[in-house]
């Protein structure tokens, strides 16, 4: 089976600004991928390249074994939900579904109708009158009912309250189970990603800082607390980030084997260590 996404030295430049630089990742099919990074890290650029909305400056990218947006058949295999869950405010819920059926050859109207009923959306309600959570549900339903092989979601829950976010993520997991579809989910909300993702890509400064299956990454990362002595780390260990207080140092360490005094680190702590290490610190500021 082809990987969902494969990139090699993928680079995107806007005039003098490098939005994405030398990005090399392989995402196995069927994964729920969390894409994390600060504003300006290159997340939306990478998603735009995956969906074929923009073209790379250099390097290569394959999505589901083919060039992104290589034709109508390839486009139908990828469902996309952009930031703020864009919908047509003057169209009703039912009109969105009819439009989806007209534009997508593999449209699953039964799936779309069931999901709309489950979330209590009025088919005659115009999208502009829906709540933020309802608009997100409608956008996700339209993307999933394409019956593609990959869903690409660009910060779809950023503006939602906790209950609406939970409902959205529940539906997303239902779609994954029912359709055997892969997902790339960009988000700043690490707690949400920790609940649903089994693969992680961390971007900062347009570069990949970390990528891999979550279970494997967590097994290789450890928190070591105590007196600041990196020399006591085993051979092959890599210090990712250290934070020092008046009395001790807390270090996030990557090592394939056991680390003396090491304790498990969660996805949030691991991710923040890489993001902090990749962020320039103003002169004189504490690290």
Language model feature labels by segment:
Residues 59-74:
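Conserved ABC transporter NBD signature motif
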């Amino acid at each position: 089976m082809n990987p969902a996404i494969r990139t090699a030295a993928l680079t995107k430049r806007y005039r003098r600004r490098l939005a994405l630089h030398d990005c090399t990742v392989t995402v196995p099919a069927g994964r729920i991928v969390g894409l994390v990074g600060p504003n300006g890290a290159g997340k939306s650029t990478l998603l735009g390249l995956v969906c074929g909305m923009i073209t790379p400056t250099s390097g290569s990218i394959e999505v589901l074994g083919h060039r992104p947006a290589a034709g109508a058949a390839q486009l139908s295999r990828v469902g996309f939900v952009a930031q703020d869950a864009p919908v047509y405010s003057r169209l009703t819920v039912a009109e969105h579904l009819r439009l989806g059926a007209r534009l997508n050859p593999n449209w699953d109207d039964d799936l779309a109708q069931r999901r709309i009923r489950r979330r209590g959306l009025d088919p005659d309600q115009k999208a502009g009158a829906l709540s933020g959570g309802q608009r997100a549900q409608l956008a996700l339903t339209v993307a999933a009912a394409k019956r593609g092989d990959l869903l690409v979601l660009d910060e779809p829950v950023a503006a939602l309250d906790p209950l609406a976010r939970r409902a959205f993520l529940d539906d997303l997991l239902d779609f994954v189970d029912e359709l055997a579809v892969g997902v790339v989910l960009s988000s700043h909300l690490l707690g949400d990603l920790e609940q649903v993702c089994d693969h992680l890509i961390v971007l900062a400064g347009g570069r990949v800082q970390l990528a891999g299956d979550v279970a494997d990454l967590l097994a290789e990362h450890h928190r070591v607390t105590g007196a600041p002595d990196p020399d006591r780390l085993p051979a092959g260990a890599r210090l990712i980030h250290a934070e020092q207080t008046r009395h001790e140092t807390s270090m996030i360490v990557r090592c394939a084997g056991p680390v003396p005094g090491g304790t498990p680190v969660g996805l949030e702590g691991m991710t923040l260590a890489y993001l902090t290490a990749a962020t320039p610190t103003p002169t004189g500021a504490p690290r």
